[in-house]
Amino acid sequence: MTPTQNEIHPKHSYSPIRKDGLEVPETEIRLDDSPSGPNEPFRIYRTRGPETDPKQGLPRLRESWITARGDVATYQGRERLLIDDGRSAMRRGQASAEWKGQKPAPLKALPGKRVTQMAYARAGVITREMEFVALREHVDAEFVRSEVARGRAIIPNNVNHPESEPMIIGRKFLTKINANIGNSAVTSSIEEEVSKLQWATRWGADTVMDLSTGDDIHTTREWIIRNSPVPIGTVPIYQALEKVNGVAADLTWEVFRDTVIEQCEQGVDYMTIHAGVLLAYIPLTTRRVTGIVSRGGSIMAGWCLAHHRESFLYEHFDELCKIFAQYDVAFSLGDGLRPGSLADANDAAQFAELKTIGELTQRAWEYDVQVMVEGPGHVPLNMIQENNELEQKWAADAPFYTLGPLVTDIAPGYDHITSAIGAAHIAMGGTAMLCYVTPKEHLGLPNRDDVKTGVITYKLAAHAADVAKGHPGARAWDDAMSKARFEFRWNDQFALSLDPDTAIAYHDETLPAEPAKTAHFCSMCGPKFCSMRISQDIRDMFGDQIAELGMPGVGDSSSAVASSGAQEGMAEKSREFIAGGAEVYRR
């Protein structure tokens, strides 16, 4: 693997864990010395992948692991159709910016085989992917296997996406975040979407969903998958709808099935399937303030009403399971009836669908197909935990994957914040992955800056939840930052931050000179009123006496604070301080 050279801070470097032939990426942060001695480098999780030419794509990391198991074979695959790239491509007569990199024949399971990580885990097999994840998460490989076998965690790794670096989604592991990208009929291009992918993974996105609904859907996805070191998710109903000229009532199982196989062959790792939207649940949404806000949910609701029957996703769910088991594609069971406003949170429609999703989870597990369950949405803070509890109960602890939730509806332009509040809360309660929200939510398609803001905000929420859960090692990052802050190691503070660029820019707005990077104050308080500098001076001046006094108010009446000797000593030090001019900073 070739490490990337363009690090987000000069103190960062690619420093993989190497063991048993595996090379698991991590970022090492070099730290300056403390007054008391040197600091060990600090290591953090890395999602960005190796530096490559986007026209060539990433190295095929897992290819040999997949073929060595002897349970897959190449085959011709479905015929590529121009409609795969949408109506604009049909009008043009060709797709734009066709992928010209490697195009190996697709793989799928041999007859009678299931090539999912769950199937291997249930058979007692620890795969190379599980070993990779164990090193990445600093846990035992057997623990990874057992969590996947029980359905409490998933490793989304399509056999046709060998470029991906294995990662795990489960509540007993680090909380993960997803970034949504994708074009629309109004804006964006293939180049922009690949750039957004690389930008999102640079800042820490653990998975990326391609939600393209505009031109060149197939080709855009090919470019994204071939350049993605993280799992790629999709909502295949979007592309299927494009194939029937945008008319939901014209969708058929045959069109949808063909679209799913197309995406399986390309290497999509997980797919959002809104199979829990049942005909009987649609009337439950009629009194909502915001109705059905999920695109996929509204498409399937429209289809159910047009045909007055259960959706083809529900009726053909077992067949979908069989297809997914051939490629190791994971279900992301979509919450098509999620609430789009606080007024609709935790209502009958939302929870009826969730209960059905729980039943579908069990059916998928019968085929050894990995599953995660999608959740809301817009939920007041006091109603969030009920979502965790019911998902864990009805979906048997399958990983929960939520969009926020937003905890208030009054802040367009700031919904990355309104949702991060809810995201931290729901992740603390057991949600395994958080789908980011950008400042453009409800307003427009996010650009690169919005993607970065969304990723950083959600990395913050995920980390806060990991700290609150007591996840092993999570607080060490905070402690390293606190130590650097107290010792005025400014460059270390920048390097340890989630977003060094912004931290440096804010610092340098008022103190741009290079000597300010070693000053024992910032522009917030200035040199005279910096609490940490004063605290350091107190330690330097009275360190021995503080140590002798111990903790005031702790212990019995015979404590050092209560003793007459201690009181006399403090009185003497008081007189010395006043006689010396009563200045904290001695000149």
From Swiss-Prot:
Q: Where is the composition biased (Low complexity)?
A: 554-566
Annotated catalysed reactions: 5-amino-1-(5-phospho-beta-D-ribosyl)imidazole + S-adenosyl-L-methionine = 4-amino-2-methyl-5-(phosphooxymethyl)pyrimidine + CO + 5'-deoxyadenosine + formate + L-methionine + 3 H(+)
Name the needed cofactors: [4Fe-4S] cluster
Domain of life (superkingdom): Bacteria
Q: Which InterPro entries match?
A: ThiC, ThiC-associated_dom, ThiC/Bza_core_dom, ThiC/BzaA/B
**One of the protein's GO biological processes:** thiamine diphosphate biosynthetic process
> A single GO CC term, please?
cytosol
Which pathway does this chain act in?
Cofactor biosynthesis; thiamine diphosphate biosynthesis
> What is written in the cofactor note of this entry?
Binds 1 [4Fe-4S] cluster per subunit. The cluster is coordinated with 3 cysteines and an exchangeable S-adenosyl-L-methionine.
Q: Where does substrate bind?
A: 180, 209, 238, 274, 294-296, 335-338, 374, 401
Keywords of the record, alphabetical order, are:
4Fe-4S, Iron, Iron-sulfur, Lyase, Metal-binding, S-adenosyl-L-methionine, Thiamine biosynthesis, Zinc
Specify residue ranges for compositional bias: Basic and acidic residues: 17-33
- Return the annotated region ranges for Disordered: 1-58, 554-574
Annotated EC: 4.1.99.17
Tell me the residue numbers annotated for binding Zn(2+): 378, 442
* NCBIfam families (alphabetical): PRK09284.1, PRK13352.1, thiC
- Function (record text): Catalyzes the synthesis of the hydroxymethylpyrimidine phosphate (HMP-P) moiety of thiamine from aminoimidazole ribotide (AIR) in a radical S-adenosyl-L-methionine (SAM)-dependent reaction.
- Family named by the database record: Belongs to the ThiC family.
What protein name is recorded for this chain? Phosphomethylpyrimidine synthase
Q: Which organism is it from?
A: Corynebacterium glutamicum (strain R)
